[in-house]
């Protein structure tokens, strides 16, 4: 259950819907079907982050597969910064060719698995 102020903040930060009324993922620029919507904290909650953006589930999982919470807090506090990450750019080019409701299991990057 959310309070009135949190609902207003969330509504103000929601991505602009397209003609079909679906929000648009700020990473891949595709409409997000209701069952594929995930809230992503730009700065992880464990690091004091409050602001969220609505992402495709597959995009959200890819962000966390590639980056640690420390990296998200330090270097990737904005969507534009996430889009500029080299591995994320490669992923976004690939996922843009998929249907809006496409989902595939995401694995941690080898760099993160080695930690």
Annotated model-derived regions:
Residues 1-24:
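Short, charged surface segments at domain edges that flank catalytic/cofactor-binding sites
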Residues 10-15, 66, 113-114:
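A periodicity- and composition-biased signal for non-globular, repetitive helical segments
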Residues 12-15, 43-46, 78:
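A general structural-boundary detector
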Residues 19-54:
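Histidine-centered nuclease catalytic patch
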Residues 49-54, 62-103:
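Polybasic, low-complexity binding patches
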Residues 98-115:
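A mid-sequence interfacial segment
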């Amino acid at each position: 259950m959310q309070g009135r102020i949190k609902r207003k903040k969330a509504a103000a930060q929601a991505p602009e819907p397209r003609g079909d009324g679906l929000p648009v993922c700020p990473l891949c620029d595709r409409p997000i079907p209701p069952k594929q919507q995930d809230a992503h904290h730009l700065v992880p909650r464990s690091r004091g982050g409050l602001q969220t953006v609505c992402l495709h589930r597959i995009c959200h999982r890819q962000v966390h597969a590639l980056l640690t919470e420390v990296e998200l807090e330090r270097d990737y506090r904005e969507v534009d910064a996430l889009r500029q990450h080299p591995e994320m750019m490669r992923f976004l080019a690939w996922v843009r060719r998929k249907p809006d409701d496409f989902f595939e299991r995401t694995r941690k990057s080898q760099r993160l698995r080695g930690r």
